[in-house]
Swiss-Prot record:
This is Large-conductance mechanosensitive channel. It comes from the Bacteria. Belongs to the MscL family. It comes from Rhodopseudomonas palustris (strain HaA2). GO terms for molecular function: mechanosensitive monoatomic ion channel activity.
Amino acid sequence: MFKEFREFAMKGNVVDLAVGVIIGAAFGGIVSSLVADVIMPIIGAITGGLDFSNYFTPLSKAVTANTLVEAKKQGAVLAWGSFLTLTLNFLIVAFVLFLVVRAMNRLKRKDEAAPAPPAKPTPEQELLAEIRDILKSGSRPQA
């Protein structure tokens, strides 16, 4: 049973999938940092220093806090600023993955589009070509 599991786990597709998941998780952290530390501060500066992560709408009259963390402690809130940040994060990840897949597809197309060198004719094909040429010229072969 262990041997079967080892053979299954070492197949190319399973190993490739595992590597992809690990790289994807690391890539997700990079993109999250890009959104939180680079893009959202720029958007905040453009909009006058607004921090979208603290945008919320109270769903209860008991919520009187000015920050999302405090408001969640007081009652139900609709944290649409966090949702906006996560949506932007998703769109950036999807766009970057689109660019990667697009580049990979272009590389594959270039490899597929490269014409293969013509195959060398076999001895039979060479003999047939000689016979064809003799018949076209109308002359008799010399023995």
